[in-house]
Each structure stands twice: as C-alpha cells, then as structure tokens.
C-alpha cells in the first residue's frame, strides 16, 4: 500500500490552473521530492494532500484512506509549512506544548515529546527564549519539530530551508536525514536542486501545474541531463585532440561528452594529464532541457 497516492489531481483558482492532472505515488519510507520554481503548483498539491484544500477533481489517498480531512488521517501526517506556523511571542517550549495539546497528546506523554523535539532541533538551551528572538534557521527547525510532536509516519515538508543561511540549511539537512533513517515517509517540496539531489529517493519535476518528469535523480540525469563537461590541463599541449571535439580555453581543453571516463582514456593516450575536472549534469540542467528555461526564471 502506498503511503501517499495522488490520482489525476486538478485545482484551479478562477482562470488560473494551479494543478493540472497530477498523478504520483510515494512508497512507505521513501523521500519523494516535488521540484519546481515558485508558482509551479507544489504548495497547492501539498495543501490538497493534507486536506487544507479540496481538489476540483481527482483523488488523494494517505495510508490507504481516501479522505485526508478525516481526523485519523490527519493524525498520521506531520506538516512543516513554508509559512512558519509559530507564535513569536511564545517561547520555543511553549510553542511545542501548544502544538502537542493541539494534537491531543496525553499529559503524561507531552513532556517527553517536548524534550525530544527540543533536543532533535538543537534548541534545548533556547527553550525559554521567545521565538521572536530566534534566528531564521532556529525558527525553521522549531517549525519542523512542531509538526513532529505527534510522531507521524508521513511527514510533509514544504520548502523547509527557504530563507536560511548555509549553516542552518545543513542542520536542517541533518534533521531530515535522521527522519529518513527512522523510516518515515517524507514528501519534500523545494526549488533548490542540490537539496533534491542530496535528500530524495525520487523526484517529480513540476512546472505550470503539470508533472514533466518523475524518476530517481540518477535516471533523470541520464535521461534529461545532457552531457558532462570535461576540462583537462596537460603537462605539454598534445596534438591529435581535434578528433575528439572540444576547444582550448586559457590553456585548458574543454569538451562536452556523454562518456567522461572513455574520453579521459583517449585524452591520456594523447598526452600526460596534469589536472582534470568533470562537471556532471544536475537537476538544473534537467529542468532546462525539459522546459527551455532556468529553474529560477
């Protein structure tokens, strides 16, 4: 049974089609990424999955249940929304207690969940500080654990690292990777390609409300990423490279190829290699090849 199943989902706001015939499944324990620019339809899709929006047509099933608004379904889902769901005038601890009570956690269990959440987010020493004094990264980590207070098996993370510095982003990555190791199902939306490459088992690329491609990162790169770029410095500039294509640029030979390893073998036969760099295709290149534009356009 799929943890999440979305079948031919559609949603419009007036004349604007936000989600257009979207279908995908997320398996138990899988981290599934929805990758696309702002306005692609990712958050609208998420909101229909968690029951915050009703689709115009199509069906959502979570853990085999076909109505995400039912209390037992909502209890199985944890959500960290893109817009912070925090009360800035409350302390970090008070926010966690509030959300724990909102989820109906029993009093005898609530204290333990609060301690776990503070430790998991690295905020134990800031528990008595008002959230309004927290850094952006600290608020994002608190936002994450507020959605985990009831220990859900399905976790929905909508742009969880937006607006944070690189160090805070890495701390959030560590949190998410820890959730992966626990076997939780994670639905992850982002417009940062490197996040999807690092965290996701499979990725669906979305634009203008449609799914353009869906597969593992490795397969997407192989199918849509295009060639790798190889740059080589030689001890002495050899002859005979013209047959391999490419061009010289500031003392370096640069060539695009689908087979970097084979190319390096031929280049080493032509001369002694001094330095080699290989830039492989990434999800930015996949998106560019699928849409003809940059992910950040």
Description of each model-found segment:
Residues 2-6, 11-207, 213:
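ABC transporter nucleotide-binding domains
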Residues 7, 63, 233, 277-279:
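Solvent-exposed beta-strand sheet faces enriched in polar/charged residues
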Residues 28, 125, 234-236, 257-259, ...:
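Non-catalytic surface loops within mature trypsin-like serine protease
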Residues 75, 147, 198, 222-223, ...:
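Solvent-exposed polar/charged
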Residues 104, 225, 229, 292-296:
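Non-catalytic alpha-helical coupling and interface elements of nucleotide-dependent molecular machines
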Residues 258-297:
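C-terminal coupling/interaction segments
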């Amino acid at each position: 049974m799929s943890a999440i199943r979305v079948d031919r989902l559609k949603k419009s706001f007036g004349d604007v089609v936000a989600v257009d015939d979207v279908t995908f499944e997320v398996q138990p324990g899988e981290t599934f990424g929805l990758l696309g620019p702002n306005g692609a339809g990712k958050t609208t899709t998420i909101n229909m999955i968690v029951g915050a929006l009703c689709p115009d047509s199509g069906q959502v099933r979570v853990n085999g249940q076909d109505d995400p608004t039912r209390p037992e379904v909502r209890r199985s889902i944890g959500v960290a929304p893109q817009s912070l769901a925090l009360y800035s005038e409350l302390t970090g601890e008070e926010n966690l207690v509030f959300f724990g009570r909102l989820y109906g956690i029993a009093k005898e269990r609530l204290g333990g969940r609060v301690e776990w959440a503070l430790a998991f987010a690295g905020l134990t020493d800031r528990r008595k500080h008002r959230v309004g004094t927290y850094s952006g990264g600290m608020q994002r980590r608190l936002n994450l654990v507020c959605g985990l207070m009831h220990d859900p098996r399905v976790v929905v993370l909508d742009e969880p690292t937006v607006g944070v510095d690189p160090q805070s982003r890495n701390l959030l990555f560590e949190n998410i990777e820890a959730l992966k190791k626990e076997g939780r199902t994670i639905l992850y939306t982002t417009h940062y390609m490197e996040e999807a490459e690092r965290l996701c088992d499979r990725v669906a690329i979305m634009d203008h409300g449609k799914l353009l491609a869906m597969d593992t990162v490795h397969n997407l790169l192989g199918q849509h990423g295009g060639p790798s770029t190889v740059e080589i410095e030689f001890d002495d500039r050899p002859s005979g490279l013209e047959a391999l294509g490419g061009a010289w640029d500031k003392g370096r030979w640069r060539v695009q190829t689908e087979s970097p390893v084979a190319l390096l073998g031929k280049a080493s036969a032509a001369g002694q290699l001094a330095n080699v760099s290989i830039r492989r295709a990434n999800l930015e290149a996949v998106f560019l090849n699928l849409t003809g534009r940059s992910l950040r356009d």
